[in-house]
Amino acid sequence: HLVAGASPVVQLVMLLLLIASIISWTMIFNKWTNLKTARTDADAFERRFWSGADLGVLYKEVSGARGTVHGLASIFEAGFREFARLRKQEGVGPITVVEGAQRSMRVALSREIDALETHLSFLATVGSISPYVGLFGTVWGIMSAFRALGNVHQATLGMVAPGIAEALIATAMGLFAAIPAVIGYNRYSNDVERLINHYDNFLEEFVSILQRQAHVPGTER
C-alpha cells in the first residue's frame, strides 16, 4: 500500500533500486560460482603440472581439450606454444625464446584478469550510489508530502506521516541494494587478488623452467 501510494518519482526510484538489487544478487551468485570453479581448475592444473608430466604431453592435453581453456591452463598453453614456435626458428637465441614466451603468457594473464574482474565494477557502483538514489527518493517524497499540506487549513501528524513513511521506503531499498553489493565487491575483490597472485606466481615459475629448457637443445623439460 505504501509503495502504491507513493509519488511517481519515488516509485521510479524504488523500481530502479529493485532492478539494481536483483541484478546485483544475480552477479553475486554467478561470481561465487565462477571464482569457485577458477580456484578448483587452478589447483587441478597445478597438481598435473607439478606431477612430473612431460610439457609437450601436457600441452597436447590442454590444447586438445574441448571448450575454451581458462586460468593457469590458458597461461601455460600460450607460453608453451610460443616457446615451441620460437625454438623451431633458426637464429633465435634462448633469451629471445624465453622473452617471447613470457610476453605471450602476460597477454594470456591479462585476459584472465579481465575475466576475473567482470561485474566487480557494477557491484562497486551499486554499492556506492544506491544509498544516494534512495535518499533522493526519500527527499522527493518528503517534499511531496509537505507540499500536499499546503492545500489544507490545519495540518496534523496523521496527514503527513503516510507520505513520510512512503518516502522512507526508498532509503530502505537503497540500503538493501547497497549492502550486499558492497559485501560482495569486497569479498570477491580479495578472492580475485589472491587468484591473480596465484597465476602470476605460476607464470614466474614456468618462466624459470623454460629458461633452463631453452639452453638444453632437444628437450621438452
Could you say what each language-model-derived stretch is?
Residues 13-16, 20-23, 130-133, 137-140, ...:
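Residue-level signal for the membrane-embedded core of alpha-helical transmembrane segments
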